[in-house]
Amino acid sequence: MRLWPRLALYAMAILLLAGCSNNSNRDYAKLPKGSYNDTSYTVKKGDTLYFIAWISDSEVSDLARINKLKPPYRLEVGQKLRLDSSSSTGRLTSTKRKSSSTTLAKSTPPPGASRCWRWPTSGQVISKYSTADGGNKGIDIAGKRGQPVYASAKGKVVYVGNQLRGYGNLIMIKHGEDFITAYAHNDTMLVNNGQDVKAGQKIATMGNTGTDTLMLHFQIRYRATALDPLRYLPAQGTPPKC
């Protein structure tokens, strides 16, 4: 299989935009999403933008935008964050709905995008894809240390390493000539550069390298353009129909 030039792949990897944070480890499966209902939030010890977005049922990219935060979204105890897009009430509900429709429009599947994608791991999606400037160009899935990370589709491993700051142990797999998937923040990496992998093959274990959050950052890219993984993945726990 003809591969893109290594330099181009490395440049593409640098452009991956993940929501890196200083999260303390939290079991999001036990945290009630949307349990906090106010227009502002005062940061407490151990809080992170991921956690605040989760309990306020907001998007990390929206909170970062209205509070003018840049990755890796470092927070200070006592810092007051706005949860609404104006000085009045309303939180991010209308903003999120508008953003969601914009995301759907901008991430229309390109030709050939419908292929047999599988979930790379199981767990709560704690940050979704966003088309906003500086937004998450994939999804972040919370889980437990050491849980399996799987190849989303068959392909060839084109990058295994940790040279890209903020992504920790990163694996990239090329699928055909146009698609690449990325798997970041792994604990152990179980594949080598140039290795062929099958769909559903275990390629790594979940960790928090490059971040303080136990999670997998996952991307699907078409000719270097980020797609919304949730538009292509089946429901969690459901095998792909292919």
Protein language model regions, located:
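Bacterial N-terminal signal peptides that target proteins for export
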Residues: M1-L9
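Short hydrophobic beta/alpha edge segments that flank linear recognition/processing sites
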Residues: L49, L81, I141, L170-I171, ...
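Short histidine-centered loop motifs in beta-beta connectors
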Residues: K68, V160, G176-G200
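Surface-exposed, glycine-biased beta-strand/turn segments
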Residues: E76-K80, S85-G168, L227-L230
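Conserved, short, structured surface segments that act as functional micro-motifs
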Residues: Q195-C242
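Extracellular LysM carbohydrate-binding repeats and other cell-envelope/extracellular binding modules
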Residues: S21-K45, F51-L92
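C-terminal motif of bacterial Sec signal peptides marking the signal peptidase cleavage site
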Residues: L16-G19
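Surface-exposed strand-loop junctions at beta-sheet edges and helix termini
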Residues: V43, L69, G143, S152, ...
